[in-house]
Amino acid sequence: GIEYLGLSSINGPLVILEGVQDAFFDEIVEFTVDGKTKKIGRIIELYEDKAVIQVFEGTENMSLDNTRTKLTGHPMEVSLAPDMLGRTFNGIGKPIDGLGPLITDVKRDVNGLPLNPVRRKYPRNYIRTGISAIDGLTTLIRGQKLPIFSGNGLPHDQLAAQIVKQASLGDGSDEPFAVVFGAMGVKHD
C-alpha cells in the first residue's frame, strides 16, 4: 500500500492526512509511531486530497512529524474459523483471551452487503433463553440481535451470561448453533 510520512492534524481520536491519493471510505490504515508502535485506524471521511481517519487505539504518542501512515487497500476484515467458538476478541477482531492468534486464511469484510428483505427466508427458529420475560414478551428468533441496556451497578453481565449459557433452539432440535456475545463496558469475568 501507499505510505505517507507526517499528519496534518490530530484532534482526539481523529487525525487528518493531506495529499492522499487512491484512498477509499472505510479503508483500513496502519500507523507506525516512532518507528515501532503500530496502531490501526479507518478512513471515515474523504474530501479532495484530505482523509479523516479514526484511530482505534487512541492518538497518544502520535506526532505530526514522525507518524508513518500506510493505506492497506482493503476495508476492515475479520478472520473466520471454527476455532473462534468460545474465544474472546477485542473490537477489531484480535484474540484477547491468551490462546494465541486464529490460524486461518478465511477473512470477511465486516461491512457486509445489505440484505434484500424480500429474498430473505422467513425466520422460523425460536431461541429459548430460559428467561420467562424474554421468552414470553420479546421472543428471540435465530439470527436476531438482543440488545441489553443497563445502568451502572445492575446485574446486566449476569443476565447476559445466563442467556448465553441457557440458549437453545425452541423446537427441541439438537441442531448446533452458536450465540455470539458482544459487549461494551463489562468486566471480563
Predicted regions and their residues:
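N-terminal accessory targeting/assembly segments
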Residues: 1-87, 91-92, 96
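The Walker A (P-loop) glycine that initiates the GxxxxGKT/S ATP-binding motif of P-loop NTPases
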Residues: 150-151
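Small-side-chain structural scaffolding
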Residues: 15, 23, 41, 51, ...
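Conserved P-loop
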Residues: 154-189
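P-loop NTPase nucleotide-binding/switch module
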Residues: 67-70, 76, 83, 93-145, ...
